[in-house]
C-alpha cells in the first residue's frame, strides 16, 4: 500500500520516517519469501494506522522534534512490525533497527569528547535547550539538574509517550530494545550513561552522563536485567 493511502489523522499524527520504513522492509525481506513481502508490509502499515486510531492527538505532529527519525512515531512503527512479525523477529533485531535510526547522527559527532569540560558543558546546554520543546508539547516531561563542574550531567524524563504506548498495548517486553540505544549513543560521544530505572517499569527515565574515563563509572557497573534493559548498579 502506498503511504499516502494509509488512513489516519494526519493533522495530529505523522507517518513513520522513510529510514524507518526502509529498516522495516529490509527486515521483512530477511524473513519472508518475495511473494509474501508486500502482504506483510501492508499488515504492518495497517497495524500502524490501527494503533494511531486511538492514540494521543496532542504530540505536535510534524512540529515536534521528538517525532522525527527514531522518535516516538518510529517507535510505534517498529512496535507495529513487532506485533505483526513477532514469530520471526528477535529482541536483538529490534534493538538493531532503533540503533540504525538513531546512531548515524551520533557517529557524525565522534569528535565530541565528554571527558573534556568544554564538550561536557555544551552537552549540558543541549539538554537544557531541549526542555523548551518538551514543555511546549508535554510529551517527554523533562528536568535537568544544575550544572556542576567535574560532576556528571543529570536529567530525567518523568513521562515518555513511547513507554506509555507500550504499556497501553502490552508491548513492554520490547521496550528495552528501543531504550538501550541511549547507551550506545552516549558511547559515540566518549561518554557513558548510568541509568537505574525507566518509565516502563518505574516513575522516570534517569540519565546520568559522564565521560568514559570518569572514575564515577567504577561505582556503577553496567549489567542487563532480566527484561533486557541495560542498567547500572
Predicted regions and their residues:
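Short, charged/polar, Gly/Pro-enriched secondary-structure boundary elements
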Residues: 162-164, 212-219
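A short, structure-level motif marking secondary-structure boundaries and short turns
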Residues: 65-67, 166-169, 224
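Short, hydrophobic/π-rich interface segment
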Residues: 141-201
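C-terminal edge-of-domain segments
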Residues: 196, 202-212
